[in-house]
Amino acid sequence: MPAIEQEALRLAHGNILDVGGGAGCHSLALQQMGKQVTAIDISPLAVATMRERGVQDALEEDFFTHEGQYDTILMLMNGIGIVGTLKRLPAFFMQVDRLLTPGGEVLCDSSDICYVFEDKDGFIDLTGIDGYYGELTYRMQYKDIKGDPFPWLFIDPDTLTEQARANGFHTEVIARGGHYDYLARITRLKR
């Protein structure tokens, strides 16, 4: 597990929501640390896998409609990517505001994928890019089975900070990885 993810697990506290739990690696690690965690994923197969692997509280739910109160919302492996586009960030922050307890926090990681546009001289050329360069469309495929395309967001730390502030939140980059990746803590601005 990358150092950034290990740091997030160490910092996670109280009642924890693991968003996009996948196969459950983070929830299982949190359980082994004696921490209380609820894992959610929209994939019924992912939830079944988590349960088979021993995740005690795994739910098939969408983050944007999930209800509950959490001290830590964990969004790892570029988990904030579920937002899809910058335009959906206000809805994301509204949901975070509903889910967080007073003093609660989001721990999320992402990558600034500007390096994809870097030329051989190290210049990053974003000319000709329509919209924000971190908004991508993914399509999963296994052998001949293809899923539907879906939007995914890679957000650079400056844009995340600006968007968070515009929606009543503070962002602090608390760790950086070796390849444009970072771990951020998002908390409510003091009102």
What are these regions, as identified by a protein language model?
Residues 54-64:
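Conserved SAM-binding strand-loop segment of SAM-dependent methyltransferases
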Residues 1-15:
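Conserved alpha-helix/loop element of class I SAM-dependent methyltransferases that forms part
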Residues 167-191:
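Core SAM-dependent methyltransferase catalytic element
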Residues 89-102:
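A short glycine-rich, Lys/Arg-flanked "PGG" loop and its adjoining helix->strand segment in the class I
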Residues 101-162:
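SAM-dependent methyltransferase
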Residues 70-90:
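A short SAM/SAH-binding and catalytic strip from SAM-dependent methyltransferases
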Residues 23-34:
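Conserved SAM-binding loop of SAM-dependent methyltransferases across substrates and taxa
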Residues 43-44:
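Conserved SAM/SAH-binding beta-strand->alpha-helix loop
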